[in-house]
Every structure is written in structure tokens, then in C-alpha cells.
């Protein structure tokens, strides 16, 4: 916690989702002496009566937790902002044949922009969320600078999803769970009598929830069947129902098992994987074998760059990067920074680099920022 976060008289608004992480966040801040208010954000309302929508139960859980902790609860609807700033981009990316990560945009545009602005209007000094990450304030050339650091619990670290935050946002943000492990968070919740102590963590994209992804996407984007071709020789080996349903490295759902990858039958029992898309021709390309060269690349181009410190990192400097969440940090160099883009070269081949996903760059535990894989 930064040196300028003396709890005496400081008002903190906590973004609460109904889960154990945000609940313990509010509890810890209250115990530390902050003036805490809980805030529940409703960011999606197209499916209020849908069997997959948990918003109503989540709000009930938040209200119960706030009652136990003894804090006030505010409810705000950001559904219009979410559709305009996050969901519209999500659909555009899928139409363009890419695989977006809406959680990154949701954080920068909704949770740390709309929510932050709303909290400040309520008179807050800081906001807090249940993200597993850390903020560090340090003096750089006589001025304060804020760094985003990985969480102590490496299995739960969420800095990857927060790489688009800026200095102003980090300066107003607290991450009380950054130094804790998940097991400790659940223990704290149980000891405090919070009924969400063992509540299952939410999974999947926030507005899709647990519903089948294809079923959800079909409501907004029309199916457009086309050919599946073998990338190696161009042969038609199947049919897809829409490029948007497939991502690079995908194995399941191609329905082309048993087809020989090569005319000579070599490797005919290897699984097929998505290796590329031709959006204009509506063709999906597949290759046979997990280690096929088309799935292994040492270089990527990134666009829409954002650097947390507000300045470019060094080129030809050894960093690490995550080309997707849940992958280990991989040694890399930023080879060039040109026209708002970057060329990133990894020390070892990376499997299934996916256009639309984020590549996030680190220097040790410090998240420097990143961009979108082109």
C-alpha cells in the first residue's frame, strides 16, 4: 500500500461483485480503518431473465456481505457504457477474424474509468477492487510514479488484465489482496462469517458467463459457413460454420478427424489444429500435429500499445512477456517501436500466437504494459 494511503478519514469505494475476493477486499479495508462503501456495478442487462445470468444472486450476495461488514452499498448501471466501449469492440474483433480479450478493455474502460469517475463523484479518495495485483509508488527523478506489480500468488496474478491502466488510475487504486494467497482470502472470509467464503469463482467472459460461447455469439453475428483447408497443400478437408467460432491453436470442434494430413499418410493419426484464417475468402486453415511449424513462432507484431509509465520501454533489452494469460513469462526483446506498434522477438518459439489477444511485457515483477497481437 502506498505511503499516502493513511486510512484515517480516507474514503474508499470498493467495487463488489458478490464473490469472495471483492468481499474480503471490503472487509480488510474496513478493519484497517478506512471509510468504506461498497459499489455493485451492473454492466450487462440483455439476459436478466436468462438461466445463465447470475446478476440478481450476485447483488443479493453483495448486500448480505455489506450488512455483515457494516458498510453502505451503492448500485450503479454501466450497461450502456459497457455496450459502447467494450461489447461493440468485442463484436468488431470477431467479425475481423480475431480473438479479443474483453476483460482487458472492461478493466481500463469500465472498472477503472466509469467506476473510478463515479466513485470520485461520491467523494471517494480511492477505489479498491479484488484483483490480485499490487501498486507501488516510487520516486522517479523527483516525482511520484506508480508501478503495477504482479501479485504474490502467482497462480492468481491478474496484472495481465490490468496492463492498460495509466498513472492517474493507479494513483487512485488499492489492491488489498495483492500480497495474499487465495487460500488465505477464503480463510479470512470464513473467519468473518461471510457466506461467500466458498463461493465458486466466476469463469469465462463476464457477459457470457457459463453459457455456450457459440450459442451466445450466434445472437449477434450471423453464421457464415466456409471451407476448412489443409494449410500445407491447400486441400479442402472440411467445412466450418463461421470463422468467429475458431481461434488459433484450437483442436476441438473441427470435425475433421481421420483425414490424412499428407498425401503419403505420414502423421495421419495426429490431431488437427487451427493455424490461420483468410477472412476475405472465409477460409479456415488447419494443420496436423501440435508441434507443426505453422503453430510455432518466435516473433509477433503488436499494435494499440500502452505503457503504464507513459514512456516507451528500451528496445533490445531483455524483458519477459505473456502472449496469453495462464502462460509462463517468456524471455523476449522489443526489437522495434514504430508507428504505435512493436516487434517482439522471443528467445524460444511460442505456440499458437493469436491475433486479438494481448501480449503483456514485464521487467521482473513490474508490468510495463503491452499491446494487441496483430
UniProtKB/Swiss-Prot annotation:
Where is the segment annotated Interaction with tRNA?
Answer: 156-158, 324-325
Kindly give the SUPFAM superfamilies that the UniProt entry links to this protein. Answer: Adenine nucleotide alpha hydrolases-like
Per UniProt, subcellular location reads as: Cytoplasm
- A Pfam family: tRNA_Me_trans
Question: Would you say which domain of life the source belongs to?
Answer: Bacteria
The protein's predominant localisation is: cytoplasm
An example of a GO molecular function for this protein is: tRNA binding
Q: Which reaction does it catalyse?
A: S-sulfanyl-L-cysteinyl-[protein] + uridine(34) in tRNA + AH2 + ATP = 2-thiouridine(34) in tRNA + L-cysteinyl-[protein] + A + AMP + diphosphate + H(+)
Which residues are annotated as active site? 106, 206
Interaction with target base in tRNA: annotated span: 101-103
Gene Ontology annotations for the cellular component aspect, listed alphabetically: cytoplasm
Residues under site feature: Interaction with tRNA: 131, 357
Report the sequence similarity comment from the record: Belongs to the MnmA/TRMU family.
Can you say what this protein is called? tRNA-specific 2-thiouridylase MnmA
- What is the organism of origin for this protein? Aromatoleum aromaticum (strain DSM 19018 / LMG 30748 / EbN1) (Azoarcus sp. (strain EbN1))
| Organism placement in taxonomy | Bacteria, Pseudomonadati, Pseudomonadota, Betaproteobacteria, Rhodocyclales
Amino acid at each position: 500500500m502506498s505511503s499516502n494511503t493513511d486510512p484515517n478519514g480516507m474514503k474508499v469505494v470498493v467495487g463488489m461483485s458478490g464473490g469472495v475476493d471483492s468481499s474480503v477486499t471490503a472487509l480488510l479495508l474496513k478493519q484497517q480503518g478506512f471509510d468504506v462503501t461498497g459499489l455493485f456495478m451492473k454492466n450487462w442487462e440483455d439476459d436478466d431473465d436468462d438461466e445463465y445470468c447470475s446478476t440478481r444472486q450476485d447483488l443479493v450476495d453483495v448486500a448480505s456481505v455489506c450488512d455483515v461488514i457494516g458498510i453502505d452499498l451503492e448500485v450503479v448501471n454501466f450497461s450502456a457504457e459497457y455496450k459502447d466501449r467494450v461489447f461493440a469492440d468485442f463484436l468488431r474483433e470477431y467479425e475481423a477474424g480475431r480473438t479479443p480479450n474483453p476483460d482487458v478493455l472492461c478493466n481500463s474502460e469500465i472498472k477503472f474509468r466509469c467506476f473510478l469517475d463515479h466513485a470520485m463523484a461520491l467523494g471517494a479518495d480511492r477505489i479498491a477492487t479484488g484483483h490480485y495485483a499490487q501498486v507501488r509508488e516510487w520516486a522517479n527523478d523527483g516525482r511520484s510514479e506508480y508501478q503495477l506489480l504482479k501479485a504474490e500468488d502467482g497462480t492468481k496474478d491478474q496484472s495481465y488484465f490490468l496492463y492498460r491502466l495509466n498513472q492517474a488510475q493507479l494513483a487512485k487504486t488499492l489492491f488489498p489482496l495483492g500480497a495474499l494467497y487465495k487460500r488465505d482470502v477464503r480463510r479470512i472470509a470464513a473467519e468473518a462469517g461471510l457466506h461467500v467464503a466458498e463461493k465458486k469463482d466466476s469463469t469465462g467472459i463476464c457477459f457470457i458467463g457459463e453459457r455456450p460461447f457459440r450459442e451466445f455469439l450466434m445472437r449477434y453475428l450471423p453464421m457464415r459457413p466456409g471451407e476448412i483447408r489443409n494449410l500445407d497443400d491447400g486441400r479442402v478437408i472440411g467445412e466450418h460454420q463461421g470463422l468467429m467460432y475458431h481461434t488459433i491453436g484450437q483442436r476441438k470442434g473441427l470435425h475433421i478427424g481421420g483425414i490424412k494430413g499428407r498425401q503419403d499418410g505420414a502423421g495421419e493419426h495426429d490431431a488437427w489444429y487451427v493455424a490461420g484464417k483468410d477472412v476475405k475468402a472465409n477460409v479456415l486453415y488447419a494443420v496436423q500435429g501440435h508441434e507443426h511449424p505453422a503453430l510455432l513462432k518466435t516473433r509477433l507484431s503488436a499494435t494499440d500499445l500502452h505503457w503504464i509509465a507513459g514512456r516507451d520501454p528500451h528496445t533490445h533489452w531483455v524483458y519477459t512477456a505473456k502472449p496469453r494469460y495462464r502462460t509462463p513469462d517468456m524471455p523476449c526483446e522489443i526489437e522495434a517501436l514504430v508507428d504505435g506498434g512493436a516487434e517482439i522477438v522471443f528467445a524460444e518459439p511460442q505456440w499458437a500466437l493469436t491475433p486479438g489477444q494481448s501480449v503483456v511485457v514485464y521487467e521482473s515483477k513490474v508490468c510495463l504494459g503491452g499491446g494487441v497481437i496483430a
